[in-house]
Amino acid sequence: LEVCVDFANPVGIITKGPLVARDVDVLTALAARASVSVTISIPFIDDDMGRRIEPYVARASRRFDALATLSAAGIRTGLSISPVIPGLNDSQIPQILARARECGATTAFMTLLRLPAEVLPVFTERLREAEPLRHGHVLSAIRDVRRGNLNSSEFGDRMSGHGPRWQA
């Protein structure tokens, strides 16, 4: 980042990690010379659900704090709701958006869960362990927005869904 400051090189960062906020001084210096944006991925509103599904990433509360810190410093911030997991976190989207806006985020996008062959067994096992009573419902909801499949690798189709549930 310091090299980017020296050369006034624009930077866009997309991360799940709140540690990006520790570079607020460098990002602020860069923002004075070039375009800077930081987008933080926050797929769950609450720490408990996030910890169960994504146990090795930072808590949602820490990510929201990072958004607030960067926004308060004048850094343009955004939100990525990724992955959207139908039947699990899709109902949280309005709350996540509202909280991110309170933290100063000015842009947002979302990406539907992708389950390529190597990820599918890991996800389904984690889901079964984390949500034993809901895992069948969640898999059904994913199929609902994926035209009956758990994944689509078609270009232009991989990151979004179809049908009324996805449109909502």
Regions found by a protein language model. Name each.
Residues 52, 78, 82, 155-161:
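Glycine- and acidic
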Residues 37-39, 68-70, 144-148:
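Short hydrophobic/aromatic-rich motifs at helix boundaries and adjacent loops
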Residues 65, 90-168:
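Auxiliary Fe-S-binding modules of radical SAM enzymes
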Residues 14-21, 85-94:
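Active-site glycine- and acidic-residue-rich loops that bind
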Residues 1-67, 76-80, 107-111:
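Core AdoMet radical
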Residues 44-46, 85, 114-117:
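Feature marks short, surface-exposed loop/turn motifs that line or immediately flank catalytic pockets
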Residues 5, 71, 98-101:
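Non-catalytic positions within long, well-ordered alpha-helices that form the structural scaffold/packing
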